[in-house]
C-alpha cells in the first residue's frame, strides 16, 4: 500500500510501511513465525540505531503463532533499552498476548474493543512418532507453558 507525499518536486508515492517506520511505528500483524520475528527485530534495530532515546510504538494485531518465534520477539523487547509503547489493535491472542504483556507497566495500551487471549501451548500440525518422541514433545510443551506462565505472573 502506498500514500502520496507532496514536495517541491511534485507528488511521489511512498510505501505506507516506510512512512510509518519513519514515524517510529512497527506493526506486528499476522501469524507470528520466524520471518515475522526477524523482520520485527530488523526494524527495531534500525529504529534503536537511529535514536536510542526516542520512543518506539509497537502496534499488535495477531492471532499468535510459533512459540520460539514469539519468544524471540519477547527477548528483543526485554533487552531493548529504548522506551517502547505497545498497543493492541483488534486482537492479541496466544503468543501475541505474551508479547503485548512484555511491555512495561503504563506503556501498554488496549483499544476499547480489542481482545487478549492466552491458552496452553498447542501441538503443531502433523505430529507423529513413537511414544518416546511424543513424550519428549509433551515435556517440551509443558516447559513452554511453565515459562510463559512465569513471564505472565
What are these regions (language model features)?
Residues 1-153:
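Terminal-region recognition feature
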Amino acid at each position: 500500500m502506498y500514500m502520496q507525499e507532496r514536495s517541491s518536486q511534485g507528488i511521489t508515492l511512498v510505501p505506507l510501511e516506510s512512512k510509518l517506520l519513519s514515524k517510529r511505528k512497527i506493526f506486528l500483524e499476522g501469524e507470528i513465525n520466524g520471518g515475522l520475528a526477524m523482520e520485527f527485530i530488523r526494524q527495531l534495530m534500525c529504529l534503536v540505531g537511529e535514536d536510542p532515546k526516542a520512543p518506539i510504538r509497537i502496534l499488535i494485531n495477531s492471532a499468535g503463532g510459533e512459540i520460539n518465534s514469539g519468544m524471540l520477539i519477547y527477548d528483543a523487547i526485554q533487552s531493548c533499552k529504548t522506551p517502547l509503547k505497545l498497543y493492541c489493535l483488534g486482537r492479541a491472542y496466544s503468543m501475541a498476548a505474551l508479547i503485548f504483556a512484555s511491555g512495561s507497566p503504563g506503556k501498554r495500551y488496549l483499544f476499547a474493543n480489542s481482545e487478549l487471549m492466552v491458552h496452553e501451548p498447542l501441538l503443531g500440525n502433523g505430529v507423529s512418532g513413537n511414544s518416546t518422541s511424543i513424550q519428549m514433545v509433551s515435556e517440551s510443551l509443558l516447559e513452554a507453558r511453565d515459562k510463559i506462565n512465569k513471564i505472565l505472573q
